[in-house]
Amino acid sequence: FGLQRFRIDYEGTKNLNDKTNTILEFKIKRYAELLGDTYLVFTLPTVYSPIYHYATEEGPTVTNKNGHEFAPYEFKWIEEIGTNMIEEIEIYSGGTSLAKYSGEYLNCMKERDFSTEKKELWNRMTGNIPELYDPANANGYVNNYPNSLFTEDGLSPEPSIRGRKLYIPIDAFFCDSSKMALPLV
């Protein structure tokens, strides 16, 4: 008896629809007899929040086009982005719905059931970390947003927020314990 981990890639377009909800359906092939811990994995893109330099007639001073004080764009992700991206999860087997819950439910379950250490791990996995939702106060910054500066020397700018993979555990009824699993027979 052995345990094998495998990855199931989504078959279809991998872009999120910005006008309507995106529905992703996965079919679990019968690689084994039982299905255990299950995760959704999303990749957040790298974000560059720039400060643009507009040259004026007087010279290359930093000002906006109207001559007013310049306020740069400061992008940040929302808190609990990994679970807030999920509106609904439904698990089917043989055409029968076995479970249905939301990303908000996953969040509430974390707050209700997990220890402090497990919450910290969950937050790192799902992207609920200051580097994503409060970059102006993360990584040693204090109310100082890490804007990307594009310079004339051709060097690549440092991103404001680095891209990363989010791992969202689908804590279904068969994932509660290592002794539990969903039969794939």
Predicted regions and their residues:
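Short, low-complexity Pro/Thr/Gly
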Residues: 1-185
